[in-house]
UniProtKB/Swiss-Prot annotation:
InterPro entries recorded: aa-tRNA-synt_IIb, aa-tRNA-synth_II, aa-tRNA-synth_II/BPL/LPL, Anticodon-bd, Anticodon-bd_dom_sf, Beta-grasp_dom_sf, TGS, TGS-like
Record localization: Mitochondrion; Cytoplasm, Cytosol
Gene that produces this protein: THRRS
The organism's place on the tree of life at top rank: Eukaryota
The protein's name: Threonine--tRNA ligase, mitochondrial 1
Reaction(s) the record says it catalyses: tRNA(Thr) + L-threonine + ATP = L-threonyl-tRNA(Thr) + AMP + diphosphate + H(+)
Keywords: Aminoacyl-tRNA synthetase, ATP-binding, Cytoplasm, Ligase, Metal-binding, Mitochondrion, Nucleotide-binding, Protein biosynthesis, Transit peptide, Zinc
Annotated Gene Ontology cellular component terms: chloroplast; cytosol; mitochondrion; plant-type cell wall; plastid
UniProt enzyme class: ligase
Keyword Zinc attributed: yes
Organism of this sequence: Arabidopsis thaliana (Mouse-ear cress)
TGS domain sequence ranges: 73-135
EC number: 6.1.1.3
Length: 709
């Protein structure tokens, strides 16, 4: 096995970093440690920690010995600006290159990319290469710091509680990290956080290097034999897969990495919350404790984030949904939401908005079944790869499944008769109800549900049409996200090591996607080797008003399903049959999830065109109630959502209640307005008042909605 470490990277975990100042525990967001009563499995710790460290050091020493026999030939390292640095094969590390550039860069670079592959800063280079260095202000740097912080968290948890660690990744939402562990009967709470944070501070102060080795499957099983969860993970790995193990201080953990240079780069650490979880999300498996955390390279950023969290709590979509009477969930149908009349208005308006765009962009809407015989899912591959996430049942001794996605049904539509090249591109849109069997512990408001709808569409086109269709989808996404007030970024994920189809088709598809993005004029982030095995994809990450990131839209080329369903069309040479390319795309993604994102993005203040409470008429007294009802009817007949407050409350109280309910327009009417056929208009968040005729007001309403529905 080839060595992946330098001699200096095998320092003992108590050795301080020579290039970075030590971190005091006061730099962490902690309070004095409280003596939380908890059992600690000392026997487990005394058995596993020394054993793992001993095995790690033995394997590491063997790899170090192997390194000595390898040729340390000169290599050229090319930086993004074109500059070339000299180095030695199997000796020079990205950290060495960073130090050549500047001391400041060496003190702040968290991770590198070698020929577009993420690489530890202290891992030797293996030949001539392109090298990029990333700090915390990049996605790659941030995610690496948080991934490494999960290991620091795991170390603190294991040392404090003697728990069996399970998995500890960055969160999928891109805000921090967590670690799952098995604690027996112990349930963690906020009271345990001070001691956990103290353990993390201790690890950071020691500047423990993150050290990497490669192991065989047998070595991994021996190393983690006392942890049944790790053993299960290892046994599930492919036989030919390279297994990597990382160490920081006393923690030796199964991990593919990469990681930051050492623990002292984490200068601010905070536990956020604890919850229960099931092993592998299966309610029939072991109950685990999950601790969420956040970390930063300085205290200022942590303080800013904690302030943001307090602000975000006020606008949690679950709270706003209840307050505005939009939706609710019920224990008799977990993961499937009830949308109340006001919430249904927003839900339908979102779909109408997309349908209006479909009309102008050449999409054809279809309706497909909700359940299919399992034979369909076997053809599509879902039976082998996705069945655990499906709801299945038997009808007349045959197995059926509720659809988790629309693509196989759309393949049947394409397949059901002979197709010609003249019909392409064929853009099929579907708002069909989808069901996915999410674990109960994973359900989270509208953002993680079991029953949902998507603005799902699939484009069947020729190879020559791919570039134009992709550009059209990007323009569609851009228009919608600008309406919502989102910013976004594009990431192109290219061919993985294992892929379906021929190399020429992949190369052309990737080139078409790159050209489409370049023509679109949006910056591109390249994720080499991160595409699906059935085709390259473009990931679209949006940022909302609070600068949180979400992945909603999808754009995926698929070479597999057309083959699985044997889809063909008659080419211009009618004697010849050709295979279409299939493009999966969604703009909103899950309508439920987009509903939640928009509710929080707007902080409950819906724009007029999508608002469930567009206007309310408030009569000053009983004398003007009849006129108020007349105004309400005129506005309603014009197709707008309008209410009337006919209570006997004073007008100031009516207006105040309407403001709190987030009505876009508050229309006050009294005897004067009744006599002139006008209304006194108050617009939300605008102190100025005006008087308008009903006709002028309706024209204003129409102008605010015409573009969208």
């Amino acid at each position: 096995m080839l060595l992946r470490l330098t001699a200096r990277s095998i320092r003992r975990f108590t050795t301080s970093s020579s290039s970075l100042p030590l971190l005091s525990s006061s730099s962490f967001c902690t309070v004095p440690t409280m003596a939380a009563n908890h059992p600690k499995d000392e026997a487990y710790l005394s058995a596993v920690i020394p054993k793992r460290i001993k095995l790690f050091e033995q394997i590491q020493a063997n790899q170090l010995e192997n390194l000595k026999s390898l040729p340390h030939d000169p290599i050229k390292v090319t930086l993004p600006d074109g500059n070339v640095k000299e180095g030695k094969k199997w000796e020079t590390t990205p950290m060495d290159i960073a130090a050549q550039i500047s001391k400041g860069l060496a003190n702040s670079a968290l991770i590198s990319a070698v020929d577009d592959v993420l690489w530890d800063m202290n891992r030797p280079l293996e030949g001539d290469c392109k090298l990029e260095l990333f700090k915390f202000d990049s996605d790659k740097g941030r995610d690496t710091l948080w991934h490494s912080s999960a290991h620091i968290l795991g170390q603190a948890l294991e040392q404090e509680y003697g728990c069996q660690l399970c998995i500890g990744p960055c969160t999928t939402r891109g805000e921090g990290f967590y670690y799952d562990g098995f604690y027996g009967e112990l349930g963690l709470s906020d009271n345990h956080f001070p001691s956990i944070e103290a353990g993390a501070a201790k690890a950071a102060k020691e500047a423990q290097p993150f050290e990497r080795i490669e192991v065989t499957k047998d070595q991994a099983l021996e190393m983690f034999s006392e942890n049944n969860f790790k053993v299960e993970l290892i046994n599930g790995l492919p036989a030919d897969m390279t297994i990597t193990v990382y160490r920081c201080g006393p923690l030796v953990d199964l991990c593919r990495g990469p990681h930051i240079p050492n623990t002292s780069f984490v200068k601010a650490f905070k536990c956020l919350r604890a919850s229960s979880a099931y092993w592998k999300g299966d309610k029939d498996r072991e109950s685990l404790q999950r601790v969420y955390g956040i970390s930063y390279p300085d205290q200022k950023q942590l303080k800013k984030y904690l302030q943001f969290l307090e602000e975000a709590k006020k606008y949690d979509h679950r709270l706003l949904g209840q307050k505005q009477e939009l939706f609710f969930s019920h224990q008799l149908s977990p993961g499937s939401y009830f949308f109340l009349p006001l919430g249904t208005r927003v839900y339908n308006r979102l779909m109408d908005f997309i349908k209006n765009q479909y009309w102008h962009r050449g999409y054809t809407e279809v309706i497909t079944p909700n359940m299919y015989n399992m034979e369909l899912w076997q053809t599509s591959g879902h039976a082998d790869n996705y069945k655990d996430n499906m709801f299945t049942f038997n009808i007349e001794k045959q197995e059926f499944g509720l659809k988790p996605m629309n693509c196989p049904g759309h393949c049947l539509i394409f397949q059901h008769r002979v197709r010609s090249y003249r019909e392409l591109p064929m853009r099929l849109a579907d708002f069909g109800v989808l069901h996915r069997n999410e674990a109960s512990g994973a359900l989270s408001g509208l953002t993680r549900v079991r029953r949902f709808q998507q603005d799902d569409a699939h484009i069947f086109c020729t190879t020559e049409q791919v570039k134009g269709e992709v550009q059209g989808v990007l323009e569609f996404i851009d228009y919608v996200y600008k309406v919502f007030g989102f910013t976004y970024e594009l990431k192109l994920s290219t061919r993985p090591e294992k892929y379906l189809g021929d190399l020429e088709t992949w190369d052309k598809a990737e080139a078409d996607l790159k050209e489409a993005i370049e023509a679109f004029g949006k910056p591109l982030v390249l994720n080499e080797g991160d595409g699906a095995f059935y085709g390259p994809k473009i990931d679209i990450t949006v940022s909302d008003a609070m600068n949180r990131k979400f992945q909603c839209a999808t754009l995926q080329l698929d070479f597999q399903l057309p083959i699985r369903f044997n889809l063909e069309y008659a080419a211009e040479d009618e004697a010849k049959k050709s295979r279409p390319v299939m493009i999966h795309r969604a703009v909103l993604g899950s309508v439920e999830r987009m509903f939640a994102i928009l509710l929080e993005h707007y902080k409950g203040k819906w724009p007029f065109w999508i608002s469930p409470r567009q206007a309310i008429v408030c009569p000053i007294s009983e004398k003007s109630q009849q006129y108020a009802e007349k105004v309400q009817k005129q506005i309603k007949d014009a197709g707008f959502y309008v209410d009337a407050d006919l209570t006997d409350r004073k007008i100031d109280k009516k207006v105040r209640e309407a403001q709190l309910a987030q009505y876009n327009y508050i229309l006050v009417v009294g005897e004067t307005e009744a006599a002139t056929g006008q209304v006194s208009v108050r617009v939300r968040d605008n102190a100025a008042h005006s008087v308008k005729s009903i006709e002028d007001l309706l024209e204003e309403f129409k102008a605010k909605t015409a573009e969208f529905v």
